[in-house]
Swiss-Prot record:
Homodimer; homodimerization requires the C4-type zinc finger motif and decreases during mitosis in a phosphorylation-dependent manner. This is Endoplasmic reticulum junction formation protein lunapark-A. The chain crosses the membrane at residues 44-64, 68-88. One of its GO terms (cellular component) is endoplasmic reticulum membrane. Pfam families: Zn_ribbon_10. The transmembrane domain 1 and 2 function as a signal-anchor and stop-transfer sequence, respectively, generating a double-spanning integral membrane protein with a N- and C-terminal cytoplasmic orientation. Transmembrane domain 1 and 2 are probably sufficient to mediate membrane translocation and topology formation in a N-myristoylation-independent manner. Transmembrane domain 2 is sufficient to block the protein secretion pathway. The two coiled-coil domains are necessary for its endoplasmic reticulum (ER) three-way tubular junction localization. Residues 65-67 are lumenal. A zinc finger (C4-type) spans 277-302.
Amino acid sequence: MSVFCLQAKPTTVEILEGIDKDIQILEDYSVKYQRQMKAVVGRLLLYSILLYLMAGVVVYSWYLPEQLMGRLVLGLPFLLFPLLVWILRKVLILFFARRTEKNNFKLEDLKAQKRKILEDVMETETYKNAKLILERFDPESKKKTDFDSTPVGPQMTPKPGQELRHRNVVPQTPPASVNSASGAAARPPLASGPAYPGRSSHSAPGGPPERNLLAIAAQQSLMRKFVTPGTPIPGVGLHPPGPPLARPVLPRERGVLDRLIEYLVGDGPQNRLALVCQQCLSHNGMALKEEFEYVAFRCAYCYFLNPARKTRPQAPRLPETAGEPKLPCDLNSSSCAAEEDKQSDSGD
């Protein structure tokens, strides 16, 4: 009979449930202690101020003695009363702080005990039971393990300023060329080659490569059709082949130190002007206000040469002084002979 009277050993779930209840109770006690401390200290200060003012008014109105010594003796409690209130406030704060500290110690012990039980569960229980227990009593670690086990694919993040440089250039071509581009898109193996036999797909160094852009656009449209969403497409959003930007594009997100340096030096986006191509209206960087009128650049997207708005003025040539050494000249030259004649005439 004694064997049947023995209580059954509590399971892991029951132990964890009891620990969770105790943790919740202790957390509620911590919040309760904080509220009680604020309420008690606030009431103490409020009642003390009201009592101090009422006592001062009553004593000043009816019980104020005429002698100086009596006034000093009567004013002594008014000087000691604020000190007494301050000491009482400190005692109350210390009392509630000790209770909160003991409560926190118990709370930390229960959390450590729960953590140890969960570690034992992962080692002793089966996968199914351990998963259910973790989902119920430790959802944060479960989410963390699921996040770590989930493979994260590479993401293509644009560099600072790259979103300003990415423009879609659509050249204006007749309908026949559009049809040929669509036909080239229908035949993927021929899209990378030249569009017409006997002609090169590269144009002159100064002109825009229309056929090359058409082939790239057709290839990108074909890749968008057969690629699933979320898969990075190579070559999309990158800088096109060609000359670099005339001036760099300043990033939007700048720190406090960068803004301070820009303010001291006089640099920054507010002190620069954008270099916009006259043909395709693409952004080619930002130049300083002093050099904006004199910058000539080739567009990095359509390769159009944008001339400078003004010609930089050149300083006048300095006049030659008498003390400068003269270059040696040939005696047989006519110029040297003329100079010698002038010198002889002046000597006469």
